[in-house]
Curated annotation (Swiss-Prot):
Domain of life (superkingdom): Bacteria
Membership in a protein family: Belongs to the methyltransferase superfamily. UbiG/COQ3 family.
PANTHER family: METHYLTRANSFERASE, UBIQUINONE BIOSYNTHESIS O-METHYLTRANSFERASE, MITOCHONDRIAL
Disulfide bond annotation, renumbered to this chain: none
Lineage: Bacteria, Pseudomonadati, Pseudomonadota, Betaproteobacteria, Burkholderiales
One annotated GO biological process: methylation
Name this polypeptide is given: Ubiquinone biosynthesis O-methyltransferase
Organism: Ralstonia nicotianae (strain ATCC BAA-1114 / GMI1000)
NCBIfam families, sorted: UbiG
Cross-referenced CDD domains: AdoMet_MTases
Known EC number: 2.1.1.222, 2.1.1.64
Gene3D superfamilies, per database record: Vaccinia Virus protein VP39
């Protein structure tokens, strides 16, 4: 039985569901996620040390980031709308002996059920795959406790991002399957910061994520013209 979600693109869900069995293959289509994951984890930890924290990973997919945060000592819940990806995530966590609570639920639904329940919320490489990213940002803001942190990452919408993230990554270097990204769904940093402020979050840090095709390595930089990450914080309760 197929479940229909209001803020989900069926084509996007099908695309990632078809690849679900390859999530944990470091040489598969998900190789970039495996390679950037240590950078993402260190960046999150530099702002919000995870040990002992309750964390929800929104759009967790096969659980690459979720597992690494659990290994860092967090109590992690991973949510996604791809049932196949969640099965892979659950099986891998069992095999690895890493405790992660996975659930097929929309961010908006979890926010309605458990508002203000998490110290940290992560939503990485996900916003560019949904019809209404602002709705997801609002849900993340609702999920986090006052004084807690919400982390996002996505792709800038400009000519350089189109050339590198779509043409370069998908058609020239073949790092990603063709059709992985829809340029129209890319989000400018100013737009994402606006979504965050409207939702009651305070943008605190903006970093770029760059890939060097000569070295095959990724690095965090101050160039946010293609891939970028933004750290936000929910103000303390008055």
């Amino acid at each position: 039985m197929t479940t229909t979600y209001a803020n989900a693109d069926p084509g996007e869900l099908e695309k990632f569901s078809e690849l679900a069995h390859r999530w944990w293959d470091p040489n598969s289509e998900f190789k970039p996620l495996h390679e950037i994951n240590p950078l993402r984890l260190d960046w999150i930890q530099s702002t919000a040390p995870l040990a002992g924290k309750r964390v929800v990973d929104v759009g967790c997919g096969g659980g690459i980031l979720s597992e690494s945060m659990a290994r860092a000592g967090a109590n992690v819940k991973g949510i996604d709308l791809s049932r196949k990806a969640l099965r892979v995530a659950d099986l891998h966590s069992l095999e690895a002996g890493v405790a992660v609570d996975y659930e097929e639920i929309a961010a908006e639904a979890l926010a309605a059920r458990e508002p203000g329940s998490f110290d940290v919320v992560t939503c990485m490489e996900m916003l560019e795959h949904v019809p209404d990213p602002a709705s997801v940002v609002r849900a993340c803001a609702t999920l986090v406790k006052p004084g807690g942190h919400v982390f996002f990452s996505t792709i800038h919408r400009n000519a350089k991002a189109y050339l590198l993230a779509v043409i370069g990554a998908e058609y020239v270097l073949n790092m990603l399957p063709r059709g992985t990204h829809d340029y129209a769904k890319f989000i400018r940093p100013s737009e994402l910061a606006g979504f965050a402020r409207t939702a009651g979050l305070e943008p605190a840090q903006l970093r770029g994520l760059e890939y060097n095709p000569l070295t095959g390595r990724y690095a965090l930089t101050h160039d946010t013209s293609v891939n970028y990450l933004i750290a936000t914080r929910r103000p303390d309760a008055p």
